[in-house]
Swiss-Prot record:
Gene3D superfamilies referenced in this protein's UniProt entry, alphabetically: Cytochrome c-like domain
List of residues binding heme c: 70, 73-74, 125
Name the UniProt record assigns to this protein: Photosystem II extrinsic protein V
Organism: Synechococcus sp. (strain CC9311)
Cofactor(s) for this UniProt protein: heme c
UniProt keyword terms in alphabetical order: Electron transport, Heme, Iron, Membrane, Metal-binding, Photosynthesis, Photosystem II, Signal, Thylakoid, Transport
Amino acid sequence: MASFFSTLRRSLNRLLIALPVLLGLMISTPAQAAQWDAETLTVPADGDGALVTFSEQEIKTGRKVFNVSCGTCHAGGITKTNQNVGLDTETLALATPARDNVASLVDYLQDPTSYDGEYSIADLHPSMRSRDLYPAMRDLTDEDLRLMSGYILVAPKVLGVDWGGGKIYF
């Protein structure tokens, strides 16, 4: 019995020595968020294949602008009014004209058209053309549109199917 208490005492002493060291390391080491790599932040700039690399700060700003201006109907990259048409990469690429690059998304935000590109939906969808009808669009600049477009294109790389998954995922 004495050897049991002796072993227990030695184990507790070791733990009491190691515990403050471990706590000190946990407290003194700041948490670091994972850094996004350049590949994740690089998206098509236009339909000709040019690429643009956004900074993390630009994507964060684009996310904030998107959430305030578009997030009510497009939270998580879905379209609440038509869950068959989301903001996922495949759906954007299949639109006419394709909306899978920054320039074409900015063009859409300025003057939106139907998914098949046949007619304008500016009276039904918030845009710069119809900013008098949609207050969330009134104060947006061209830079805001560019940053939102960057966020829309980077989000599927970061979130995967959680971005724009549509009705099959929700």
